[in-house]
Design a protein with these regions (language model features):
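A phosphate-binding catalytic loop at a beta-strand-loop-alpha-helix junction
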Residues: 1
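Alpha/beta hydrolase fold serine-hydrolase catalytic domain that processes acyl esters and thioesters
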Residues: 4-172
Length: 172
């Protein structure tokens, strides 16, 4: 992963304790099984629960991401209601437009990921004709990909990071 490459490149310059890498909206892109080793504890993946991108490819297909996963407040979380209006204001201040992100899409994203895992449980199933057809059907029913991608906007992540404290992040 890029985060791993960056932190590896800095290791000759300083000790590992002095290197931290923060990523945003990081998909699961490796099939190596060492992604949670202590060596990668300095990589922090900040993710939005309503963002589909960090949930793909599916972990059940054998994919993972390096480092520690930290989730922004999401619809239904205890800290969400306390911070959402502040996030919207920060977004508008930064971008000059209202925030199009729909946090309630978290339920649709959760349902889509669950259904996808049931219908296409393995990577081999994905590349089959039935897997491709199932994927297209899943996207066509009940999920507006353009609207869901609003949760992936960098401006949404930046606005959230401006209004929360470290305690507001949920680890997984």
């Amino acid at each position: 992963s890029y985060a791993d490459d960056m932190t590896s490149g800095l290791r000759p310059l300083t000790t590992l304790e002095n290197i931290s890498c923060y990523t945003f909206a990081t998909p699961e892109v490796t099939q190596f099984d060492n992604t949670r080793e202590a060596l990668y504890n300095n990589i922090f993946n900040i993710m939005n629960p309503s963002d589909l991108v960090p949930r793909l490819p599916l972990a059940s297909w054998g994919y993972a991401r390096y480092g520690r996963d930290l989730w922004l407040p999401g619809y239904g979380d205890a800290t969400f209601n306390d911070r959402y209006a502040d996030m919207q204001a920060a977004f508008e201040e930064n971008v000059g437009a209202e925030c199009p992100y729909v946090p309630e899409d978290r339920a649709q994203v959760d349902a889509f990921i669950e259904k996808l895992g049931e219908q296409i449980p393995t990577q081999d199933d994905l590349v089959s004709a039935g897997g491709i057809a199932s994927l297209i059907q899943d996207f066509a029913v009940g999920l507006d990909p353009v609207r869901v991608l609003y949760g992936h906007y960098p401006g949404v992540y930046i606005a959230w990071m401006q209004v929360i404290d470290a305690d507001d992040l949920r680890s997984s």
